[in-house]
Amino acid sequence: MKLAKLFILSLVMIAGFSGCEKKDPTALHEVHWDRDMCVRCKMVVSERHHAVQVINVENGRSYMFDDIGCTILWFHEEKIEWAPKAKIWITDVDTGKWIDARTAFYDTMNITPMAYGFAAHESKESIKEGEEVVDFEEMSKRIFEIEAKNNRKAY
């Protein structure tokens, strides 16, 4: 009887300690397609080939976006101080796989949820020949140009 109690106590302790495992603060959070809303424009995130998830690595909080344009503008509009350290995940337009947005390659002629037109690719090779390819920095710069041209807010 004493051995059985000791065994049960051991199982409870093992279960308790396994719940204390430290999680990766940059890891993707579960996405609730067609229910999560874009933090900036409040549209429902349903397009699985243009979605963006930003992780604040300081506290592990996740933010969903329907278009990379909303992400870039949100960082600026909300004056997000932790933006340089943020982990930015974006879905590859061809595979739907989550990739690092800062190292992705972007083509510029896509129909995207908010019409910014940038689609992410894990490699340059997956972009059709003849299409313009830009990196994260150039794409970000162009988002502000598009926004300034199309909207009255000046960036």
Feature-to-residue mapping (PLM):
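Sec/Tat-exported extracytoplasmic proteins
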Residues: K42-V45, F75-W82, I143, E147
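Beta-strand-rich cores of mature extracytoplasmic or soluble domains
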Residues: I88-Y155
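Bacterial lipoprotein signal-peptidase II cleavage site
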Residues: E21-A27
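Bacterial N-terminal signal peptides that target proteins for export
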Residues: M1-F7
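C-terminal motif of bacterial Sec signal peptides marking the signal peptidase cleavage site
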Residues: G16-G19
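Mature extracytoplasmic domains of secretory-pathway proteins
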Residues: S62-T108
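Short, flexible, mixed-charge glycine/proline-rich loop motifs
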Residues: A27-W33
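Post-signal-peptide N-terminal segment of Sec-exported extracytoplasmic proteins
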Residues: D36-I72
